[in-house]
Amino acid sequence: MKRIVQVKNVKIGEGIPKICVPIVGATSKEILDEAEKLKELTLDIVEWRVDFYEEVFDIEKVKDTLSKLTTTLNEVPLIFTFRNKIEGGEREIPIEYYLKLNLEVAKTKLVDLIDVELFIGDDLVKEIVEVAHDNDVKVIISNHDFFKTPCKEEIISRLIKMIQLNGDLPKIAVMPQCEIDVLTLLYATNEVKHKYPNNSIITMSMSGRGIISRIAGEIFGSCLTFGAAKKASAPGQIGVEELNSVLKVLHENI
């Protein structure tokens, strides 16, 4: 039986792929203003990309903004993400602070999911996963390659590793250098879908070349896609209303 990851009233892994929209404001005001505007859109989940937040090194300010953000979003599930620069993020932070930030946020129980980067190391990933689960927070274990698309076997290997580390939602995003790279990502996604049917996964091929991967998740096996409300947080993101329309057409004709 396929594993459904439920956050609030949203069931990730069931039916049509869910749409997540990132918030990338630099100040608390910008973040909360973005959240207000998102209420007008048809979306399922919001991701706070805290690496864009100028006060990210002040945990108390992070918690304060987080509290206000969850109040504004109300019943919309929230992903908390600090994306390191090497994986396409806005800035880099020391690994010790990355760990502390994620653990402290998990303990607030104000977020529904935390995104943890696979390559921070197994022990740190396990520690964050354990604390998050103890506080009823789900975990996305992720990997982003903004330079290339690894071979099919490597993509599959990374997704399996995320499953073995007890991630609720393994996620991989890769950069295609040609059309075949996009097919490689889709092939790997489909293979994991069939070999590990009990696990929901998130995959995407970035840039305009990889756009098919953002809309065809229901066919190949990716349960969540990212759309842009304003500023895209990754290359190739589609406007959320357009994304909704395309996903609906595909869903109704599969």
From Swiss-Prot:
UniProt-listed Pfam families: DHquinase_I (PF01487)
Enzyme class, spelled out: lyase
UniProt EC number: 4.2.1.10
GO MF annotation: an example: 3-dehydroquinate dehydratase activity
Active site: 144 (proton donor/acceptor), 171 (schiff-base intermediate with substrate)
Source organism, top-level taxon: Bacteria
Reaction(s) catalysed (UniProt annotation): 3-dehydroquinate = 3-dehydroshikimate + H2O
Transmembrane segments: none
Biochemical pathway: Metabolic intermediate biosynthesis; chorismate biosynthesis; chorismate from D-erythrose 4-phosphate and phosphoenolpyruvate: step 3/7
Residues noted as binding 3-dehydroquinate in the record, renumbered to the chain: 47-49, 83, 214, 233, 237
Keywords annotated in UniProt: Amino-acid biosynthesis, Aromatic amino acid biosynthesis, Lyase, Schiff base
InterPro entries on file: 3-dehydroquinate_DH_AS, Aldolase_TIM, DHquinase_I, Type-I_3-dehydroquinase
GO annotation terms (biological process): 3,4-dihydroxybenzoate biosynthetic process; amino acid biosynthetic process; aromatic amino acid family biosynthetic process; chorismate biosynthetic process
Assembly behavior: Homodimer.
Function of the molecule: Involved in the third step of the chorismate pathway, which leads to the biosynthesis of aromatic amino acids. Catalyzes the cis-dehydration of 3-dehydroquinate (DHQ) and introduces the first double bond of the aromatic ring to yield 3-dehydroshikimate.
NCBIfam families found in the cross-reference section: aroD
Family classification: Belongs to the type-I 3-dehydroquinase family.
This protein's name: 3-dehydroquinate dehydratase
Species for this entry: Clostridium botulinum (strain Eklund 17B / Type B)
Lineage: Bacteria, Bacillati, Bacillota, Clostridia, Eubacteriales
Gene: aroD
